[in-house]
Amino acid sequence: IVLSHTLPSEKLASYQIPVIAIEREAEHISSVNTDNYMGALQATSLLIRDKCDILIHINVNVNKSAPAYDRIWAFQATCEEYHVPYDIDLSVKGASYHELLDVIREIFNKIESKYPDQKKGIFLANDTYANMFLNLIFQKYGTFPSTYEIVGFDNSPIASEAILPITTIGQQIDVIAKTAMDLLVQQMEEQKKRVPKPLGEPIHKQITPILIRRNTTE
């Protein structure tokens, strides 16, 4: 089961061993992913329903072959479909928490100066970024003003443990894990046969995420 970006799927496929990718580029091998498009659609639709004046997505510059790119694509497509003003900031980068925080702080300051009086709907790539952004709001205002809504992604522990519990898109980790194991065992059982039948085409499974509404949205 591969969760890193170290080896491309073409290389992994050449080893001819049972292998499953989770949330990674997987053109040539089987994979299990969260339905990232659906998750971003849920997040964006919520911010639109809550009548935010401007929607902003904050992320790293994701490779288009990565499943997580669908979060960017869905955000943009949904905003354009409903004719909602939006901005996409893919400048997040850093090898440490403090490097990431410095970049998130720059983005926060830019948003503050560009959209001071508008209701801002912020959809962040994950709950770590969402918590950083939330802390910056509290450091400036001492509260969570009505001019902000925040949605994260993953439903990691930090989302519920934050100073204000964060609305997020929950990945069904238990379902992802079971599906990956089922696919892996299926491949392993096939290899035990006297004449193994190679998998014709890679199998790609998408697991539906769940919108978890908390205190950073209406």
Protein language model annotation of sequence segments:
Residues 1-42, 113:
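Alpha-helical recognition/docking segments in bacterial nutrient-uptake
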Residues 6-8, 63, 71, 128-130:
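Alpha-helix capping/helix-boundary segments
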Residues 32-57, 73, 77, 99-110, ...:
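Hydrophobic alpha-helical segments within soluble ligand-binding/sensing domains
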Residues 43-89, 196-217:
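An alpha-beta-alpha
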Residues 89-100:
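Short beta->alpha junction loops
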Residues 110-218:
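Flexible loop/turn connectors
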